[in-house]
């Protein structure tokens, strides 16, 4: 009986902690997919990835992930035709605009745009 009462008290304590937690602040997620002019060219891919890594110096970027298509199960809904992708997280749209206008981003575009034939961007506002 005591164990049950203790568990009940722990549950109540956990519920109180969950209720007291601050609300999650929405973020802006910026996901970019690049298709190279010369698909499969390792030097071009490496140069693009090196350029993307320079963007980490921009302070308003909360998180930056850089990657290539994953070796996952082939399914009709999976598009793995891109060569390189980057995913960034910002606190808000104002910070994303600061990033777009930042000299490091502008230098990246100038030094790497000759590498890609196509770029697709998905911007998302998180809900929770």
PLM region spans:
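Short, well-ordered beta-strand segments in beta-rich or mixed alpha/beta enzyme
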Residues: 27-36, 72-100
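An amphipathic, aromatic/His-enriched active-site/gating alpha helix that lines ligand/cofactor pockets
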Residues: 2, 23, 50, 54-60, ...
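Short, glycine- and small/hydrophobic-rich beta-strand elements in well-ordered beta-sheets
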Residues: 18-20, 56-83, 121-126
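A broad, structure-centric signal for solvent-exposed, well-ordered loop/edge residues
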Residues: 43, 62, 71-74, 97, ...
């Amino acid at each position: 009986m005591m164990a049950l009462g203790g568990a009940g008290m722990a549950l109540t304590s956990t519920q109180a902690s969950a209720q007291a937690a601050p609300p999650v602040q929405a973020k802006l997620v910026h996901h970019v997919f690049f298709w190279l002019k010369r698909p499969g060219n390792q030097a071009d891919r490496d140069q693009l990835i090196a350029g993307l890594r320079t963007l980490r110096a921009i302070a308003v970027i909360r998180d930056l992930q850089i990657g290539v298509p994953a070796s996952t199960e082939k399914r009709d809904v999976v598009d793995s035709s891109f060569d390189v992708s980057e995913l960034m997280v910002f606190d808000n749209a104002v910070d994303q605009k600061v990033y777009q206008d930042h000299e490091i981003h502008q230098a990246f575009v100038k030094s790497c745009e000759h590498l890609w034939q196509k770029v697709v961007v998905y911007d998302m506002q998180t809900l929770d």
